[in-house]
Amino acid sequence: MSNQQALVIFSGGQDSTTCLIQAIQTYGRENVQAITFQYGQRHAVELERARWIAQDLGIKQTVLDLSLMRQITHNALMDDTAAIETAENGVPNTFVDGRNALFLLYAAIYAKGQGIRHIIAGVCETDFSGYPDCRDVFVKSMNVTLNLAMDYDFQIHTPLMYLTKAQTWALADEMGALDYIREQTHTCYNGIVGGGCRECPSCILRERGLAEYLESKKAV
C-alpha cells in the first residue's frame, strides 16, 4: 500500500501510537502523517508526548487548536480540579461530548486538502471506558456522513476496534514496539508518562491488559 497515504489521529497514547507504528509499517513512513488536537486536556504532557513520538518516528505532525470546546462543555478530562468518577449510566465524567466526532471531521478536512483518503483512529469498543463515540456504529456513520458532506471517498480505519487491551499489547509486540509503547506513551489521566499512576480508569485498563498479555506470553 506504499502508493497510498494515511492520516493517523494521534494523541501520544498507547492506542494511537500502536496505530501510528502499524500505519508506518503498512503505508511506509513517507506516506503517513499524524494529526493531534489540543482541546484543553488536563495535562500538557499528552501534547508533549505526541510531539516527541512523532519526531522520533520521523512523522509529520499537525496540531490543531480545538480549545474552544472548553467554552461549551465541562468534564473531568478538561478540568484538572475535578475528581474522576463514573456516572450511574456507566459513562465516566472524562467523556467529552462530541470529541471524536470533531476529531474525525477536522481530520477529514485536513486529509482531503492533502489528498489523503485513509484516516486511522485508535478507538476501541471491546475494552473501552464506556465512551459512546468509541463504538463501531458511530465510526461507520461518521464515515458515511463525511463522504457525503465532502463528496470524497474517505476510508476510516479502526484497527483496534475489536481488540482487548491484552490483544493491543500483543499487536505492539508483534510489531517489535512493545517496550517503546510501554515506556514512551502517555495514557494516564493524572499526567504520568509510561507506567502511569496505576489508579485512574485509563491506567487500570492499560496495566490489566499488559499483565494479561505478559501472563499469556509466559504460558506459551
Curated annotation (Swiss-Prot):
Function according to Swiss-Prot or TrEMBL: Catalyzes the ATP-dependent conversion of 7-carboxy-7-deazaguanine (CDG) to 7-cyano-7-deazaguanine (preQ(0)).
EC main group: ligase
Residues involved in ATP binding: 10-20
GO terms, molecular function: ATP binding; ligase activity, forming carbon-nitrogen bonds; zinc ion binding
Superkingdom field: Bacteria
EC number(s) on file: 6.3.4.20
Family in the record: Belongs to the QueC family.
Keyword Zinc in record: yes
Catalysed conversion reaction: 7-carboxy-7-deazaguanine + NH4(+) + ATP = 7-cyano-7-deazaguanine + ADP + phosphate + H2O + H(+)
Annotated keywords: ATP-binding, Ligase, Metal-binding, Nucleotide-binding, Queuosine biosynthesis, Zinc
Chain positions recorded as Zn(2+) binding sites: 188, 197, 200, 203
GO aspect biological process, one term: queuosine biosynthetic process
Cofactor: Zn(2+)
Gene name, Swiss-Prot/TrEMBL: queC
Protein name per the record: 7-cyano-7-deazaguanine synthase
CC cofactor note: Binds 1 zinc ion per subunit.
Pathways per UniProt: Purine metabolism; 7-cyano-7-deazaguanine biosynthesis
Family annotation (InterPro entries): QueC (IPR018317), Rossmann-like_a/b/a_fold (IPR014729)
